[in-house]
Amino acid sequence: MIQVESTLQVADNSGAKKVACIKVLGGSHRRYATVGDIIMVSVKEAMPHCKVKKGDVMQAVIVRTAKEVRRADGSYIKFDSNAAVLLNKQGEPVGTRIFGPVARELRARNFMKIVSLAPEVL
């Protein structure tokens, strides 16, 4: 469950390390986002000489949340941290590698590029 001002780790090699949610997309008064949702983020920490820099505003898709997500079969999945993958204007990942596991819900949301780059899909 991600809301405005939540901080997330970045799970790709775009150069950003931490981002903060500044808007949950998908409705005028939508409050929370979960795995597979797209949010607007501001880069808070970034490595030097990389694709993104501190202060950049971009879209991101949530790939891991510490709050459990209920699946259709009744099982739950949760992770140790909140993490996102940065997206460009076309909705494609900015980075070329994904770090750590990602949730299976991304496949249902048609983020096939992220699923194929991820080392593990849970």
From Swiss-Prot:
GO cellular component: cytosolic large ribosomal subunit
A GO term for molecular function: large ribosomal subunit rRNA binding
Keyword field: Ribonucleoprotein, Ribosomal protein, RNA-binding, rRNA-binding
InterPro entries assigned: Ribosomal_uL14 (IPR000218), Ribosomal_uL14_bac-type (IPR005745), Ribosomal_uL14_CS (IPR019972), Ribosomal_uL14_sf (IPR036853)
Entry-linked SMART domains: Ribosomal_L14
Annotated Pfam families: Ribosomal_L14
Top-level taxon of origin: Bacteria
PROSITE patterns linked to this entry: RIBOSOMAL_L14 (PS00049)
Biological processes per GO annotation: translation
Role played: Binds to 23S rRNA. Forms part of two intersubunit bridges in the 70S ribosome.
Subunit structure: Part of the 50S ribosomal subunit. Forms a cluster with proteins L3 and L19. In the 70S ribosome, L14 and L19 interact and together make contacts with the 16S rRNA in bridges B5 and B8.
Family of the protein in this entry: Belongs to the universal ribosomal protein uL14 family.
Name of protein: Large ribosomal subunit protein uL14
